[in-house]
A protein has these predicted regions:
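Small-residue-biased structural context
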Residues: 1-185
């Protein structure tokens, strides 16, 4: 699998988790409660580790600098926009984690706050993934050489083993499969 295909495949996993988050949000709307704080914590771990450290790490450390080297602008361009959205995602995950903590401390309004931030995160990621899949990644395929992409893939493997940890990727996929069976079937 080449570097860009790896990022596209990771987007599929992210889309599944945001569908699961939508279902959890629907349950919050119906009951005012979080049906499983454990499942929410698992999703937050996925968002922080897989989405941010792994996936965004690959983009920020390798893809974006490579695009800048071939003249794709950071300021006012797609790279800058993606970086800004990555930060917005981090901020929203922090807000969701804070709301979960407040919920666990007995705050009756915290579930709805979590749902509000989850909705914002879902919208952000849906739009972000569309931009990357349909604009940024085609730019990368067009402008980056096969050698650059091959080197990038090796770098991706290093990020995965060093920032995420051996076996963690597979562990996340098992978690997603389990939550998918609970929430989406």
């Amino acid at each position: 699998m080449n570097a860009i295909n790896e990022l596209l495949t990771e987007h599929e996993a992210v889309r599944l988790t945001i569908e699961i988050l939508k279902k959890i949000g629907q349950r919050i709307d119906a009951t005012g409660k979080i049906s499983s704080t454990e499942h929410v914590e698992q999703l937050f771990e996925f968002f922080s580790t897989f989405v941010d450290r792994c996936h965004h790490g690959k983009e920020e450390e390798l893809l974006f600098p490579a695009l800048e080297q071939v003249g794709i602008s950071r300021e006012g361009g797609p790279v800058g926009e993606m970086l800004q959205e990555h930060q917005q995602g981090r901020d929203l995950v922090a807000k969701m984690k804070a709301a979960l903590s407040q919920y666990l401390d007995g705050d009756g309004n915290a579930a709805r706050q979590l749902k509000k931030h989850a909705d914002e995160y879902i919208t952000l990621l849906d739009n972000h993934i569309d931009k990357e899949n349909n604009v940024l990644f085609p730019l990368a395929v067009k402008h980056l050489s096969a050698n650059t992409l091959a080197g990038m893939k090796k770098g991706f493997d290093t990020i995965e083993s060093e920032k995420v940890g051996e076996g963690k990727h597979e562990e996340f996929h098992r978690m997603i499969d389990s939550l998918e069976r609970i929430y989406l079937h």
